[in-house]
Regions:
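Polyanion-binding loop/helix "lid" in catalytic or ligand-binding cores
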Residues: 208, 257-308
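Aromatic- and Gly/Pro-rich donor/ligand-binding loops
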Residues: 25-86, 97
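Secondary-structure-rich domain cores
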Residues: 69-140
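Acidic/Gly/His-enriched mid-domain segments of enzyme catalytic cores or analogous surface patches
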Residues: 1-52, 124-213, 219-221, 379, ...
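Acidic, Ser/Thr-rich peripheral helices and adjacent loops at domain boundaries
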Residues: 134-143, 147-156, 180-184, 243-262, ...
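Long, compositionally biased charged/polar accessory segments in the mid-to-C-terminal portions
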Residues: 292, 296-420
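Short, polar loop motifs at secondary-structure junctions
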Residues: 117-121, 162-168, 305-309
């Protein structure tokens, strides 16, 4: 973690000229270096970028304008212990979900049901209405997937939980919306600067999948008992990678596109109920991020899936699941979470703070100056190194001047381009 922080502070673009050297063989060191290499790739590949920053700020502005509440600082202190004890079903769209649907139906009154991403279509087909639906993408794909359910009245029974950058059209589909800032994103950092510290909470591990967001949010709120359905993080059969009731398959159960051709599914992970399963890189990262969250949270997490083994969870066969919670307790916990953990921002006050801090005229002038940094021709590798350093210094200076959005818009994209 110290090395990751150091790379961020000096500029991730230095990865282009970074090398790993081991002076002697040590298995523990080999593993650590391998993990560091993967995490450094994640910093670049999954970092912020111009479009995400631009749309994130626009969508957050819309959310505040339409009175959508945001997660408070240290949210677990705002929820009573009795509510934290209510079980939570995290429902992903992995292949194991098909076999676990009967258990979800059987225990529906004893838990808070949270559907994640494309799992919503599967739950709808089986007559299950979740209390919350989680989404994480800022683009409009979350709207397009949801309307494929083709049941607007069904969606209006469900509360949406998401990050602050969620698309406004997606928000309009649901009964109500509850948001959390996502740490490290331009929209989060730029808006956090407008308010005193300890005003809002922010999620540190809400990536790369929506399951990571849901688990990060709900463990941060303080819930203590989780059951994982369809969060496989891998698959036994490469042709059976999601629930067959979802949009990845036809009504006859055939793949709508060649999943293995589009994804490298050759990675191997230890299995939850079997020695090994296959996976793809995104799921491998997702598993690792989730394991880091569970290592520091006080929660009992049961993994019912025939997928990847997840450190910090307990393998649980569906026939061994026993829940003790009433529907009344569950409903009280849902209501308490909505009322006590999230709060609205005054839009007029927000807009005043924002306009006082960020001047669009300064941004336009800085963009003109930034453009002049680029010479018509680069004659050597040294010229390129100088240019990269000048660009870095320029955007950092803008950040320190505290009157422009230039750093928030360009930092992630520059890091990506200059580390290639």
């Amino acid at each position: 973690n110290d090395l990751l922080v150091q790379f961020q502070s000096i500029g991730p673009y230095v990865l282009a000229n970074s090398y790993f050297y081991q002076s002697y063989y040590n298995q523990g060191l080999v593993t650590a270096v391998s993990q560091l290499r993967e995490q450094l790739q994640v910093i670049i590949a999954m970092g912020d970028y111009l479009d995400n920053a631009k749309y994130g700020l626009s969508h957050t502005h819309s959310a505040i304008k339409h009175h959508m509440p945001l997660m408070r600082y240290k949210p677990s202190t705002h929820l009573e212990s009795i509510h934290k004890e209510v079980p939570v079903f995290i429902v992903g769209n992995g292949p194991s979900l098909d076999d676990l649907i009967p258990l979800i139906k059987e225990e529906a009154d004893a838990a808070i049901i949270v559907s994640c991403g494309t799992a919503l279509q599967t739950l709808y087909k089986h007559g299950i209405t979740p209390h919350f639906h989680a989404e994480i993408e800022s683009n409009r794909s979350t709207y397009d997937w949801a309307i494929r359910v083709n049941a607007p009245d069904y969606l209006k029974q469900i509360s949406l939980i998401s990050c602050n950058g969620i698309h406004p059209d997606t928000c309009n589909l649901y009964k109500d919306v509850y948001l959390a800032f996502k740490q490290g994103e331009a929209s989060t950092v730029s808006i956090a600067e407008l308010y005193p510290k300890k005003t809002f909470g922010a999620l540190d591990a809400a990536y790369p999948t929506v399951t990571n967001f849901a688990m990060n949010l709900l463990t941060e709120i303080g819930f203590e008992q989780f059951y994982l359905f369809g969060t496989d993080m891998g698959f036994v059969d490469e042709n059976y990678h999601h629930s067959k009731s979802s949009g990845y398959y036809s009504e006859k159960g055939n793949e709508l596109y060649d999943y293995t051709a589009e994804n490298n599914t050759s990675l191997i992970l230890p299995g939850n109920f079997r020695p090994v399963v296959k996976t793809k890189y995104e799921f491998k990262v997702s598993k690792s991020v989730l394991e880091n969250v569970l290592s520091v949270k006080k929660a009992e997490v049961y993994n019912l899936n025939d997928g990847a083994k997840i450190a910090g969870t307990k393998p649980l066969r569906k026939e061994d699941a026993i829940l003790v919670c009433s529907a009344a307790q569950r409903d009280a916990a849902v209501e308490a979470m909505k009322q006590q953990v999230f709060k609205e921002l005054d839009f007029d006050d927000f807009e005043k703070r924002f306009n006082n801090r960020y001047d669009s005229n300064v941004l336009i002038e800085e963009l003109s100056q930034f453009h002049l940094l680029v010479p018509t021709e680069l004659e050597s590798k040294e010229d390129l190194t100088v240019l990269i350093e000048e660009q870095r210094n320029f955007v950092v200076k803008s950040l320190l001047n505290k009157n422009s959005l230039l750093f928030f818009y360009l930092n992630g994209t520059l890091n990506y381009i200059n580390s290639s």
